[in-house]
């Protein structure tokens, strides 16, 4: 099983603000692009992937939306608008939730009020954690054992204090090459390497 976590530090947890932020400073379209490239293949979707979108621009708690492809039946289409609508629906369903609650959005999709840090702590139990770093081990030289989990960010870099927490949890740095890439591009390269080596 492959897991991907996209930490969207500027993405609003209010559904209307989220939708209004497409193409604006928060760049919420990044979530749809990354989700699209993580889940879908031509004429179908992968059935061995879990994607966590962590939206952090909030007045109360971060929202973590989980897409588990083993259980997803219908997501509304392969296009950006369908994915943005699904994320907005999850945010609407999350209204009024208290800390560390989870609600079902649709088959294979849940929304939780857990932070990025708590999510990664939980994932570290079952997954081998990787964070992107130009100075890390090349993905082509990295050995993947068990279930890999890849930690990505939107256009706002990961805070330095998060790196220390991730290191303590055993996260390893991997490189996809010398260029800084969009999260949506990273997932394509990661999938390709793992597919080739399966």
Swiss-Prot record:
SUPFAM superfamilies: alpha/beta knot
Molecular function, one GO term: tRNA methyltransferase activity
Domain of life: Bacteria
Enzyme Commission number(s) from the entry: 2.1.1.-
Keywords: Cytoplasm, Methyltransferase, S-adenosyl-L-methionine, Transferase
Chief place of localization: cytoplasm
The UniProt record lists the keyword Repressor: no
The family this protein is said to belong to: Belongs to the methyltransferase superfamily. TrmY family.
NCBIfam families for the chain: PRK02135.1
The protein, known as: Putative pseudouridine methyltransferase
Organism: Shewanella baltica (strain OS185)
Taxonomic path: Bacteria, Pseudomonadati, Pseudomonadota, Gammaproteobacteria, Alteromonadales
């Amino acid at each position: 099983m492959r897991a991907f976590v996209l930490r969207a530090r500027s993405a609003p947890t209010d559904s209307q603000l989220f939708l209004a932020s497409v193409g604006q400073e928060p760049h919420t379209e990044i979530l749809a692009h990354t989700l699209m490239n993580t889940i879908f293949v031509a004429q179908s979707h992968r059935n061995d992937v879990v994607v966590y979108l962590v939206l952090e621009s909030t007045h109360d708690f971060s929202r973590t939306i989980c897409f588990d492809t083993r259980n997803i039946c219908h997501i509304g289409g392969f296009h950006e608008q369908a994915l943005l609508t699904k994320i907005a629906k999850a945010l609407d369903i999350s209204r009024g939730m208290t800390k560390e609650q989870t609600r079902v959005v649709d088959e294979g999709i849940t929304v939780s009020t857990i932070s990025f840090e708590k999510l990664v702590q939980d994932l570290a139990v079952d997954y081998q954690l990787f964070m992107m770093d130009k100075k890390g081990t090349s993905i082509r030289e990295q050995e993947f054992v068990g279930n890999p989990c890849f930690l990505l960010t939107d256009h706002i870099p990961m805070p330095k204090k998060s790196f220390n927490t991730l290191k303590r949890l055993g996260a390893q740095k991997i490189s996809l090459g010398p260029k800084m890439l969009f999260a949506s591009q990273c997932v394509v390269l990661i999938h390709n390497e793992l597919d080739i080596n399966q």
